[in-house]
Regions:
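Extracytoplasmic c-type cytochrome modules immediately beyond a signal peptide or single-pass transmembrane anchor
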Residues: 1-106, 122-137
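The canonical Cys-X-X-Cys-His
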Residues: 106-117
Length: 137
């Protein structure tokens, strides 16, 4: 999936940075598009000491801490809107936390996203916690 993100310009598109909080970090952006006809939402999570929007704009690679992905997969997990979840390090390797690879039917992701309005596990409908999404076609 990470290789597909790179091939389809998710990684290189101009991003709309905005301020946020846990678990995705104080500065982030969201890119949305399709990979193999599957809706894909990518959140770039930036962090570090005294981070600002300006610092990330100037040197995004320095501040990038994680890339989190939601991908809609037909009949994958109907109980949770068929979303597949993954959390990558900037180098493309998957995060491992508490001896668990952060991908698939990730309970941490699902638990948080169940609080989103709109019944689709995305925060696109929550104007107070969302910013402009960059769309890649």
């Amino acid at each position: 999936l990470f290789i597909q993100l790179k091939k389809q310009s998710f990684m290189d598109v101009q991003q709309n940075l905005y301020l946020g909080g846990p678990p995705h970090g104080p500065v982030r952006s969201v890119v949305e598009g399709s990979i193999n006809n599957q809706k894909t939402i990518v959140k770039f999570n930036y962090g570090g000491p005294d981070i600002t929007l300006e610092k990330v704009t100037k040197d995004p690679k320095k501040w990038l801490k994680a890339i989190t992905v939601m991908q809609k997969r037909l009949n994958y997990d109907q109980e949770n809107q068929d979303w597949f979840w993954a959390k990558y390090k900037p180098d493309g390797t998957l995060f491992v936390e508490n001896n668990q690879v952060r991908m698939g039917k990730d309970s941490g992701c699902i638990g948080c996203h169940q609080s989103a309005s709109g019944n689709d596990l995305t925060f696109k409908h929550n104007e107070t916690v969302n910013a402009n999404v960059t769309v890649v076609n």
